[in-house]
Amino acid sequence: MKTLSEIKEILRKHKKELKEKYKVKSIAIFGSYARNEQTETSDIDILIDYYEPISLLKLIELENYLSDLLEIKVDLITKNSIHNPYVKKSIEEDLIYI
């Protein structure tokens, strides 16, 4: 199981590629990994914001790319997709930006 520090380092190393290929403006970890409550079966929750909208197919491609890169199942959401204010507040409390 990777640590939060290892995950952050991997994402930092690929930040330029994420920006160029997927138009990622910012990337943040939230959920169990951000709260240091992850288990062997935990996935990693990642929030992205982008410079320009990307298609659903590109978003799925990015989610798969990150899962392969981190060797952990990634649940990816975009900043613009959070409409429920309670969910948004809960996520924002955990965010660790890379």
Swiss-Prot record:
Binding note for cofactor: Binds 2 Mg(2+) ions.
Reactions catalysed: L-tyrosyl-[protein] + ATP = O-(5'-adenylyl)-L-tyrosyl-[protein] + diphosphate; O-(5'-adenylyl)-L-tyrosyl-[protein] + ATP = O-[5'-(adenylyl-(5'->3')-adenylyl)]-L-tyrosyl-[protein] + diphosphate
Cofactor names: Mg(2+)
One MF annotation (Gene Ontology) recorded for this entry: nucleotidyltransferase activity
Top EC class of this enzyme: transferase
Motif (GSX(10)DXD motif): 31-45
Pfam families (UniProt xref): NTP_transf_2 (PF01909)
Keywords of this entry: ATP-binding, Magnesium, Metal-binding, Nucleotide-binding, Nucleotidyltransferase, Toxin-antitoxin system, Transferase
Residues that bind Mg(2+) 2: 43, 45
EC numbers for this chain: 2.7.7.108
InterPro entries: NT_sf (IPR043519), Polymerase_NTP_transf_dom (IPR002934), Type-VII_TA_antitoxin (IPR052038)
Subunit structure: Probably forms a complex with cognate toxin MJ0125.
Protein name as catalogued: Putative protein adenylyltransferase MJ0126
Lineage, opening ranks: Archaea, Methanobacteriati, Methanobacteriota, Methanomada group, Methanococci
